């Protein structure tokens, strides 16, 4: 969020475009735009506006009611004339209620409405404020007897463990927004009582693609995001991560009991009023492989009964209005047809493109700069490195050869991103660490030396990838 040229009292605001977890303590001053003549007045309040999400995270020590904080933030936004862009809003020092209770205020997902790095003006926007408080408890593991692995892990959402996960995942083609809109529509259709015999939807999402592309993380981040966006309707949210491999027991007929126990637990959660339940089944192709093996005679018939029981239990959950099933698969060709037919969305999550690779490395380097591991560079505005979409404005031939300048830095970062073609997002996140470990002087803060080393590290990592 940045200032609007219209001068109003207390209209100044600071914003940082860093990871929301860290950026709350590192505000960056944004320059004020020059006044522009506006022959036409802003649109009236009754005209259509863009809905922009404003997420407000309460401090762990806060005992304030979420509704009170929501109203306080809405009043703060109404009293300010600003432009809207993704980033953190500095909490006004004179608002003691917000200072005492709010950890951060974040503007989210404005890129869905704007193009070419534009911003939304205050009269174009209707802020939708979501208040939440993170749960600091870790996952609760289901303990099984006889040395069996746990059949599921349970999180209460929104969990501190998943804080910032949504923002750290970068994809092309609006995948994250597509999933958000799907989930919102699925819950709305259920809430409005749409007849499922006339309009069918199963509330099942299938993400498939090669390993390391963030499918499981995206499912967890989606559950976290929806627990924040839907907390006025569902004040209690839980994530159940099913361990598909644990559903197969070495004892005959025991596997069916494990499935029954698992879904009995899920059914109890679903029946609670005001509860929203997310069921995550990771590596769902393992179930498909077991069923095929059982049909061919190489596995006991108990395996196929487990898979069929699981599918039957999933069908039973269809009648529950407050459950969403998230599934992932690493092997697209091995996905069971029964699962494919049930999924409303079947999204392929492939290796990162050049644009995505650059943005991932950019976020990593900004984090290292903010922690003082490497130094900033000449012409850098605080910790912000230009995004991939704005590079054409930054890369001029006259400056690109001057080291430690923004154009040179971006050019080197692009070279590193090009050298990472074929690497997964998981490998890309490790690259800055491996590059720093390869430095002759690990205490050197020279950004040019670090980037050159990262380019070499990227080439080495790519050459060591299996064919």
Curated annotation (Swiss-Prot):
Plays a key role in chromosome recombination during meiosis. Mediates meiotic chromosome remodeling and crossover maturation. This is Pachytene checkpoint protein 2 homolog. One of its GO terms (biological process) is homologous chromosome pairing at meiosis. Belongs to the AAA ATPase family. PCH2 subfamily. Signal peptide: none annotated. Disruption phenotype: Reduced fertility. Reduced number of seeds. The keyword ATP-binding applies. It is found in: Chromosome. Keywords: ATP-binding, Chromosome, Meiosis, Nucleotide-binding. Its main location: nucleus. GO terms for cellular component: chromosome. ATP binds at residues 209-216. SUPFAM superfamilies: P-loop containing nucleoside triphosphate hydrolases. It comes from the Eukaryota. Gene3D superfamilies: P-loop containing nucleotide triphosphate hydrolases (3.40.50.300). InterPro entries: AAA+_ATPase (IPR003593), ATPase_AAA_core (IPR003959), ATPase_AAA_CS (IPR003960), ClpA/B (IPR001270), P-loop_NTPase (IPR027417), Pch2-like (IPR044539). It comes from Arabidopsis thaliana. One of its GO terms (molecular function) is ATP hydrolysis activity. Transmembrane segments: none annotated. Pfam families: AAA, AAA_lid_TRIP13_C, TRIP13_N.
């Amino acid at each position: 969020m940045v200032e609007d040229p219209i001068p109003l009292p207390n209209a100044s605001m600071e914003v940082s475009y860093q990871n929301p977890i860290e950026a709350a303590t590192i505000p960056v001053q944004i320059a004020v735009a020059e006044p522009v003549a506006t022959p036409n007045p802003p649109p009236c309040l009754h005209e259509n506006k863009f809905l922009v999400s404003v997420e407000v995270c309460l401090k762990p020590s806060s005992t304030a009611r979420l509704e009170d904080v929501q109203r306080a933030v809405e009043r703060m936004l109404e009293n300010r004339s600003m432009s809207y862009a993704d980033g953190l809003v500095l909490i006004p020092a004179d608002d003691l209620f917000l200072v005492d209770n709010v950890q951060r205020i974040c503007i989210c997902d404005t890129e869905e409405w704007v193009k070419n790095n534009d911003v939304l003006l205050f009269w174009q926007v209707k802020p939708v404020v979501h208040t939440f408080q993170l749960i600091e408890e870790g996952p609760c593991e289901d303990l099984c007897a006889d040395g069996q692995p746990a059949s599921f892990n349970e999180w209460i959402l929104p969990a501190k463990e998943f804080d910032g996960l949504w923002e750290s995942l970068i994809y092309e083609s609006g995948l994250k927004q597509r999933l958000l809109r799907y989930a919102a529509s699925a819950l709305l259709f259920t809430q409005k009582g749409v007849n499922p015999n006339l309009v069918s939807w199963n509330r099942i999402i299938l993400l498939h693609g090669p390993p390391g592309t963030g499918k499981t993380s995206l499912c967890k981040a989606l559950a976290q995001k929806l627990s924040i966006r839907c907390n006025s309707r569902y004040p209690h949210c839980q994530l159940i991560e099913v361990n598909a491999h644990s559903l197969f027991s070495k004892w005959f007929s025991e596997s069916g009991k494990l499935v029954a126990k698992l879904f009995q637990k899920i059914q109890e959660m679903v029946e609670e009023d005001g509860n929203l339940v997310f069921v995550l089944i990771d590596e769902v192709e393992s179930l498909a492989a077991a069923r095929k093996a059982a049909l061919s005679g190489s596995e006991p018939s108990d395996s196929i009964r487990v898979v069929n029981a699981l599918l039957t239990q999933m069908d039973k959950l269809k009648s529950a209005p407050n459950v969403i099933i998230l599934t992932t698969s690493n092997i697209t060709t091995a996905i069971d047809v029964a699962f494919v037919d049930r999924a409303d969305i079947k999204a392929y999550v492939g290796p990162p493109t050049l644009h995505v690779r650059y943005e991932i490395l950019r976020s990593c380097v900004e984090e290292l700069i903010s922690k003082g591991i490497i130094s900033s560079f000449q012409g850098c505005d605080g910790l912000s490195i230009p995004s991939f979409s704005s590079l054409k404005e930054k890369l001029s031939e006259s400056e690109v050869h001057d080291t430690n300048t923004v154009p040179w830095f971006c050019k080197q970062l692009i070279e590193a991103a090009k050298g990472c073609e074929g690497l997964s997002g998981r490998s890309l996140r490790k690259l800055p660490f491996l590059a720093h470990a390869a430095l002759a002087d690990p205490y050197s803060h020279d950004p040019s030396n670090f980037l050159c080393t990262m380019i070499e590290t990227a080439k080495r990592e790519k050459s060591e990838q299996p064919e």
